[in-house]
Amino acid sequence: MGGAFGEVHGAKLLGLLRAARDGAGRGGPRAVLLLLDTGGVRLQEANAGELAISEIIHAIVQVRSAGIPVLALVGGRSGAFGGGGIITACCSRIIVSQHGRVSVSGPEVIETNKGVEEFDAKDRALVWRVCGARTRYLSGGTDRYVKGGIEDYREAAIVLVKHAPPFALPTLTAEQQRLTERLRRFGDCRDAPEIWRKAGVPEPERIADITDDTFLTIQRIQGADHDAR
């Protein structure tokens, strides 16, 4: 269908978030978990879908401002792209497994608009180096990497709900400073292995091939933890 966000789906999610916001401090939910597996907006409902995305983002900000953490869990075959990727980035914390991918423009979209020379969507290794879960986790684009079982996601969510940062100006300022420093250190890198090598990650060319257990022993880049999330 080209995505999962249309008028009806967007309205349902928006209603869920507003109900959580209105229940803050009155016995409502203590957290909101979004299980995202989406390419973004349904192409058949482009305008309605884009409007739904913007309203959902606004609602997430309201829920977080009310003191309720919003967690994104990404691990399906579609990942979280387009508006779904932006929604993911707005959450308090993000949990991914090896098959999860998070990005704004999907590989096919980039290839269609810029050509295969710019981005080959069929190059699986390239796609995972750019927007795959391991790249996102090491660089701070996500907050927790799990092995992929339901129980793994559940345990990670329970921990992260308790450590979600407040949604306030100092948090956003600290996050902007972190991103500025990341751009300064790695802005001239052309591929993920260059970033890992510069950051001191051992054998960066093998990141995609090692087991989850081995990957989880790797030290993240200093300053990778998100302040805004």
Task: Identify what each model region corresponds to.
Residues 40-171:
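Conserved catalytic cores of soluble enzyme domains
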Residues 1-11:
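STAS-typified acidic loop motif
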Residues 10, 29-30, 78, 130:
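Generic hydrophobic-segment detector
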Residues 12-43:
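A structural preference for short, pocket-lining loop segments at secondary-structure junctions
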Residues 22, 37, 120-123, 143, ...:
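Acidic-enriched, low-complexity/disordered segments with a strong bias for Aspartate over Glutamate
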Residues 158-229:
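Intrinsically disordered, low-complexity segments enriched in small/flexible residues
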Residues 9-16, 52, 87:
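Hydrophobic alpha-helical membrane-association signature
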